[in-house]
């Protein structure tokens, strides 16, 4: 663990990140990570294949932060299809301050591991819509 990082990243998460990045899935997919407060470690919360943005919104807890690595099947105006991958840091305004700090202080280390350039932050679940994501990915 580095000096500016509160939580370690579990080996399971590192393996799942590697598998997720090199997956050949043709669907939207989400790798949802959370902080195990007692162990101060980032752990796998859930992997969901074939999940829409709306379903992802319904899956995330209302009052607890999460890290989401999301692959989105994007159909461009010229009908090309791409699968951009992004890192979404979800931290609800009303979550516990201690939890917000743990997530915020670990975010940079996780971003380095994920190695994605598309990094977004949302504070409310209703911000996470397909329109929002498409606008960010353009």
Curated annotation (Swiss-Prot):
Q: Does the keyword Nucleus apply?
A: yes
PROSITE patterns membership: ADF_H
Tissue-specificity statement: In ovaries, expressed in follicular epithelium, in polar cells, migrating border cells, and centripedal cells (at protein level).
Q: Short name of one Pfam family for this protein?
A: Cofilin_ADF
Alphabetically ordered keywords of this record: Actin-binding, Cell projection, Cytoplasm, Nucleus
Name the GO terms of the biological process aspect: actin filament debranching; border follicle cell migration; negative regulation of Arp2/3 complex-mediated actin nucleation; regulation of actin filament polymerization; regulation of cell projection organization
Picking any one GO molecular function of the record gives: Arp2/3 complex binding
**What Gene3D superfamilies would the database entry show?**
Severin (3.40.20.10)
Q: Which GO terms describe its cellular component?
A: cell periphery; cortical actin cytoskeleton; lamellipodium; nucleus; perinuclear region of cytoplasm
Per UniProt, subcellular location reads as: Cell projection, Lamellipodium; Cytoplasm, Perinuclear region; Nucleus; Cytoplasm, Cell cortex
The chain positions of domain ADF-H read 3-138
Against CDD domains, the record matches this protein to: ADF_GMF-beta_like (cd11283)
- Effect of a null allele: RNAi-mediated knockdown results in not severe delays of border cell migrations in stage 10 egg chambers. Simultaneous RNAi-mediated knockdown of GMF and flr results in an accumulation of F-actin in follicular epithelium of developing egg chambers, border cell migration delays, and in deformation of bristles in the thorax. Simultaneous RNAi-mediated knockdown in border cells of GMF and flr enhances the accumulation of F-actin foci.
Role summary: Inhibits Arp2/3-mediated actin nucleation. Together with flr, promotes Arp2/3-nucleated actin filament array disassembly. Promotes debranching. Regulates lamellipodial protrusion dynamics possibly by facilitating lamellipodial retraction. In egg chambers, enhances the retraction dynamics of cellular extensions in border cells and thus together with flr plays an important role in directional migration of border cell clusters.
UniProt lists the family membership as follows: Belongs to the actin-binding proteins ADF family. GMF subfamily.
This chain belongs to which protein, by name? Glia maturation factor
Q: Which organism is it from?
A: Drosophila melanogaster (Fruit fly)
């Amino acid at each position: 663990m580095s000096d500016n990082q509160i939580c370690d990243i579990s080996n399971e998460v590192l393996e799942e990140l590697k598998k997720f990045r090199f997956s050949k899935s043709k669907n939207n997919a989400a790798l949802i990570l959370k902080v195990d407060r007692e162990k101060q470690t980032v752990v796998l919360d859930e992997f969901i294949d074939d999940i829409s943005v709306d379903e992802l919104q319904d899956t995330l807890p209302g009052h607890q932060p999460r890290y989401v690595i999301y692959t989105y099947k994007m159909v461009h105006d010229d009908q090309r299809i791409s699968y951009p991958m992004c890192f979404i840091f979800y931290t609800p305004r009303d979550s516990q301050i201690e939890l917000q700090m743990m997530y915020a202080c670990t975010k940079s280390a996780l971003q380095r591991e994920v190695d994605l350039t598309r990094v977004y932050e949302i504070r409310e679940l209703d911000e996470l819509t397909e329109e929002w994501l498409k606008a960010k990915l353009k």
